[in-house]
A protein has these predicted regions:
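Alpha-helical transmembrane segments and their immediate juxtamembrane cytosolic regions
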Residues: 1-245
């Protein structure tokens, strides 16, 4: 499916619309996970309705990650240079770490909790090598052995690095890549894998609906806005947690 921009509007959702859905649901989730969580923990807010609101926001946030997983696999498929793509993810992993720790751990550095860009980078590193293997052999058995070993290696790395979504996140991304030719099957598998981390990931299945409506067009040129938004919004939430709660 082509991702080229086109002047003719296709029915369905563009890549930009998917990104906005992911950003909005992610922001709702992170607002709850950082600001509301610390407010509740510090008895800054004690009304019982806030706890219900907190959980509702976390459930809404489950929609974001499957969309990001789908967009990552699309990026791996259509990027001109997957190694540059990996480097970009790695740079933003480093940029995002202090804001992430501020927002989630009320600390400037927490060795036991790394941001999701590390998870994405590990998965993309595995996918990049899978693509190289695919170029060198057409034997299904060899390809599948490489897929399993690379997915396992990246997942183990995520587990020991304590990345966001841990090994489950990496497995979900690798599965989405391996099954990419069937979008719905890929995302059903992805969301099922995410259930390993928490029963709340049942809400992740909602993301399949907008993904199914994706029409293959990128939309506008806002690539770096979506990258910078992640550390920027975490920094804002982190400052609120650090100085106002």
């Amino acid at each position: 499916m082509s991702q080229r921009n086109t002047k003719t509007k296709k029915p369905g959702l563009t890549g930009d619309v998917l990104k906005w859905i992911a950003i909005i649901t992610m922001t709702i989730d992170h607002l709850a996970a950082s600001v509301m969580y610390h407010a509740l923990s510090n008895d800054f807010i004690i009304h019982p309705e806030y706890k219900a609101t907190y959980w509702m926001m976390r459930f809404i946030g489950r929609i974001a990650f499957p969309i990001y997983i789908f967009l990552i696999t699309e990026g791996c498929r259509y990027t001109k240079n997957i190694w540059k793509y990996l480097a970009r993810l790695s740079v933003f992993a480093l940029i995002s770490e202090i804001p992430f720790d501020m927002a989630n751990n009320d600390s400037f550095f927490c060795p036991d909790d790394q941001n999701v860009f590390f998870t994405l980078a590990l998965a993309v590193a595995a996918i990049a090598i899978m693509k190289e293997v695919d170029k060198k052999t057409e034997k299904p058995a060899l390809r599948w052995v490489s897929y399993i070993l690379l997915s396992a290696a990246a997942s183990v790395a995520a587990y020991f690095l304590h990345t966001d979504y841990s090994f489950v996140g990496v497995l979900a991304i690798c599965a989405a890549w391996i099954l990419r030719e069937n979008r719905i099957a890929a995302m059903l598998t992805t969301c099922t894998i995410l259930l390993i981390s928490s029963p709340s990931e049942l809400f992740a299945f909602i993301a399949i609906w907008p993904i199914a409506l994706y029409n293959g067009t990128k939309g506008s040129k806002l690539k770096y806005f979506f990258y910078f938004y992640y550390p920027a919004h975490l920094l804002i939430f982190g400052l609120i947690v650090k100085f106002l709660i």
